[in-house]
Every structure is written in C-alpha cells, then in structure tokens.
Amino acid sequence: MAQRPFTKVTPALQQAMQAFSQNDHLRAIHLCDTCLQANLHDVNAWHLKGRCLTAGGLYDLARKHLKNALVLKPNEPSILASLGRLEIELGNAEAALTALNQALQLQPSFPEASLEKGKLLERMGEYESARKCFESINSASPFRDDAEYSLAQLHFHAGAFSEAVEQAEKLMARTDDQSTVYRKTAFVQGRALDKLKKFDQAMAAWKKGNANFQTNFDPNEYASRVDAYMKVYAEETVQNLPRSSCQSLKPVFIVGMPRSGTTLVEQILGAHNQVLSAGELRHIEILAQSLPDLIQSKSSMPDCMTGIQADLLDQVAIRHLKELEDLNQDQCLRVVNKSLENYWFVGLLHQMYPMAKFIFVRRNPFDNALSVFSNWFNPHKYSYTYTTELKSIGFVYRQVERLMQHWTNLLPEHILHVEYEALLGDPERESRKMVDHLGLEWDPNCLQFHKSDRLVLTLSYAQVNRPIYRSSQDRWKPYEKHLGELEEALGHHDR
C-alpha cells in the first residue's frame, strides 16, 4: 500500500461519520467501503471502518483496518488511540498501554487518549495513575463530563464511597437529567450509597438512572420470539435438521442473563492453560442477522433455519473457526465466547458445531434482577431494552429460563447448568465440573483466576480481579420493600 494518505473528507465519509455517531455501524461500514472503492488510500475511511468493526466486536478485522490506516499515516495520534481502545476490548493491557502512550507522546493534550488510558489504568488497579489522567483532562480543558464521570467511578472502585457520592452529586447537578452521563453517574452514586448501607437512597439513585426511558421493549414480542425458537427446534423435528460435518470441540459458549456470574465463570475457565477467554464476541449474532440472505429466505430468524443446508453450515462453521483461530495465538484447545445473546442461538450453534459445549449460568432471580437494575445498560440497544424496569427484568429472566430449559431438554449432554451461589459456596467443586464438561484435565490455576493478567471489560471487572467473594449473595434483602413488582413478575420463583 502506498504511503501517501488521502485525507479529504468526502460527502460519503461525512455520511459515514454521522452514521457512526448515531451508532448505525453497519451503514457506516458500507459508506466507508464506498470511500475505499473510490480511493484505497483514504486513511479516514480505513480508520473509521476500524472503529466501526471494533464497536461491532469484529476485533481481528478491526485491527487490520486500523493497521492499514497507520501504514498510510504512521504518527496519527487518533489512530493510535483507536488501536489502544481495540486492544482494551481484547483484554491486552500491555499493547493497549503502548498504543495510548504513543498517542500521548505525539499529542500530550489529547483528552480522548488520556481518558482511555485512565480507564485502562483503573481496571489494572493503578488508581492514583488513573486519577492523574482524569484530572489532567480537566486541567487542560473546560469541564468534560466524561472525565468527571470517570473520576466518580474511580472513587467507587478504589473504595472511597463517600467521595464517589460527592463527585456524582457534583456532576449530576450540572448535567441534564435526560443525558446519558447523568444516568450513568446516578448508577455509580447508587452503588456507592449501597456500600454505605444507605439503601433507600441507593434505590432512589438507581430509579433516577432508569427514569423516563422510552424503550421499545414489548414483552409479548419477546415471548413470541422464544416460542418461535422452541417451535423451529421442537423435540419432534430437531433430529431432522441438518448439521455441519465439523467435529471441532474448540468453541465453548457461556450463556445467561447479564449480571448472573458469566464473567466469573469465563475467568475461571480462562485461567486454564488450554482455554482462551475471548470475551463477548458478536460473531454469532452478526452471522444470525445475515443468515436469511445467505439462505435466500424471505423469513427471518429462526424460521429461515428450516431451509438451511448442511453445506452452508459447513461454510459458516469453518469461517467462524478461522475467526477464533485469528484470536487464538497460543493455540488453546478451547476458545470461550461469553456473548450473552447466544442463548437465542444454541440450536444454530449445535447445527454448526455438533460437539460444542455450553455453560448456562444461573443466579438467584432477585439478586440477578437487582444487579441489572442497579447498573448502566444502554436501553436503546435492542438487547437491553428491558433493563430499566424491574418488572421487565423479571419477565425476561423467566423467558430466558424457559428457553434454556428447552435447549437443555434437547441437548442434555451439551449444556451444563452452573448455579452462581453454588460456585461461591464451593469454587473448586463447581470449577472441576466445568473443566470436566469441556473434556479437559483439571488445572489448579482455575482457582487463581484473579491473578490473571488478562483485562476484564464487563461491569464485573472489579469483582473478578480478586478471589471469590460472597458479598453479592442475598444482596436484594435490604431492598425487599422496593421489589414488589419484581416479585410479581417472577411469579413462582423462590427467593
């Protein structure tokens, strides 16, 4: 590739940038492709497409695009910062820090790079260095709510709960109560108040964070979707559905509700010397979206699956294995994908990989639902439209249970149920069960998962960086008087 970059912002690139700002990553990618077809040296198109692919979870492809952008413009701080963000997503702390430091050496007053570096250092437990990054942003520029929010979160994770509440109150007082930063800050404030045992105030803060969202969550539509998967993959028809000839044991899928303990399970398995924890890969979700076109079906998922052929399953299985191998530099025997949405696709995944194993993580429904309600999930994303109301969270909990019980009835040898509370109570016993389920020999490193140098990005990162703890068990009890609609939504579930 020639070294001279094309840096003009074309109309197509302007449209791509607008689509990216609106989180319409697929449209942005198509527009970037249009730019690159017109001029292969368009550094901005390579860069933006790399950012879109990062946001979409296609990390290896994203890295290739960002590296192409760097070939064209080697000392561009914004590209280096994007590469740093990609490495953070992959859990590669050292590579991320290198890229971000390079960006800041080239442009010391680069707030976006300082912000990413601060968040990275926080996740690494280097709280004082992280604080300096955030404060440097505020000293070099006017009030930036993202830096102020990061300071509040830093105080919380450092155990300075009163300071976290104070920082959150200061930020919320100067931001619009409908803004994303206000809502995210309210969740931090609530969690800090919870640690201070000010439970009513904590619940009030979480309600502020969840208030007045106009989401499109439709419980009837959600239940109908579950029904559709259970119909296509009914017990009397599933044996007649085609399967690929792929006999690989490499893909492993962890599924469950958000905040159910899936990150802990992933970290335990990832500490095994023959297991790679790949994080929340979106490859299968993206594949599922494309299947109707690949099958040339007018029906959407899952109805289109009645028309799929074994040769297409072979193709997509091999392609996905190649994507896993691109991440699997250490040639591990198992690669774990913990994208929670995969509970929809257990049937598809079994067709692709008839030998693959699944782990379904379950948690006490009251603890699980409260944990979802008390954390920020973007409710404008389809996956999380239910997270702003306790009754909706309870409803989805029951639907996930219903669908996973169906998959388990169909594939009892392939799906292991892990109870979060049992894992806390006897980590070695439950960890041995999981390792045995994957067909591997026991590795005592699984009990030392908190010593891993892999970066954890999910909301659970502060918890899984230390040994097993039980403070998250029965967390709902001080909030019992606030959980009436949740109890009604959960129906028969025991506490």
Give the positions of each predicted feature:
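Short beta-strand segments
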Residues: I254-G256, Q267, G279, R334-S339, ...
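Alpha-helical solenoid repeat scaffolds of the TPR/TPR-like class and their adjacent stem/linker regions
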Residues: M1-D330
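Short, flexible, mixed-charge acidic loops at enzyme active sites
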Residues: S290-S297, S371-P379
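PAPS-dependent sulfotransferases, especially Golgi type II membrane carbohydrate sulfotransferases
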Residues: S162-M172, D176, T185-S248, D303-T306, ...
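Active-site glycine/GP-rich loop and adjacent strand/helix microenvironment
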Residues: H320, S339-N342
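Long C-terminal interaction/binding lobes of large macromolecular proteins
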Residues: F345
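Conserved phosphate-donor/acceptor-positioning beta-strand/loop module used by diverse small-molecule
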Residues: L349-V372
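Conserved nucleotide-binding/hydrolysis micro-motifs of P-loop NTPases
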Residues: R282-H283, P365-N368, L423-L424
